[in-house]
A protein has these predicted regions:
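Mid-domain alpha/beta scaffold segments of enzyme catalytic cores
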Residues: 1-131, 135, 194
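Catalytic pocket-lining loop regions of alpha/beta-barrel enzymes
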Residues: 111-112, 125-196
């Protein structure tokens, strides 16, 4: 069985526009436009899965502002009713009802949350982040973190391996945390130094 554990989809009405923005951002930051592998719709993901022999995909939505989480988590729950797809939930670390949102995510049967410190503009070792990480650990929710650089975002980088190490040493066990991109995209020496 082949499982793609880190995928992204968007509602059909915004998918094309969102992909254009993300691709454009990579061109601004990297000087080269990085093309998406699918059209970012659920149908596009399923088609890609069929073409590549992927049995199951896990979708990682990202709440990029404090007002999106209820819609994102409702769509995530709907995604989980489909064959072959599982979706995490999301919340924004600065939203006031973060704790209630985590309980809602748990109640909806979602496996965990996706946090993207670059898109959400928070440091992984900030108090706002740590309180969420601790609560997720308490609730038994997985946390997938974007770690290291993002090809479409200018520095500073908000989740470098050294910052994640501080969280693991002083705040959380990390047993429920998944550091995407091998612990720090394009920060491989720091991954080896702080996380291996």
């Amino acid at each position: 069985m082949i499982i793609d554990f880190h995928t992204h989809t968007f509602p059909e009405k915004i998918a094309e526009r969102t992909i254009d923005i993300l691709e454009s951002n990579t061109e601004k930051v990297q000087g080269v436009r990085s093309k998406a592998h699918t059209d970012a719709t659920v149908a596009g993901l399923l088609k890609s899965m069929d073409e590549c022999g992927v049995d199951i995909s896990v979708v990682m939505p990202i709440a990029t502002n404090t007002k999106q989480s209820s819609t994102i988590n409702r769509v995530a729950q709907e995604t989980n009713s489909r064959d072959r797809l599982f979706s995490f939930g999301s919340l924004h670390p600065m939203q006031e009802d973060w704790e209630k949102t985590l309980y809602d995510i748990k109640e909806k049967g979602l496996l965990g949350i996706k946090l993207h410190p670059e898109y959400q503009q928070f440091y992984i070792d900030s108090p706002e982040s740590v309180r969420i990480l601790k609560k997720c650990e308490e609730l038994g929710l997985l946390v997938t973190l974007h770690t290291g650089l993002d090809i479409g975002v200018f520095p500073p980088v908000h989740c470098m391996p050294e910052r994640l190490r501080r969280v693991l040493d002083y705040e959380c066990s990390g047993k429920n945390m998944i550091a995407a991109h091998m612990g720090g995209w394009r920060a491989w020496d720091d991954v080896e130094k702080y996380l291996v």
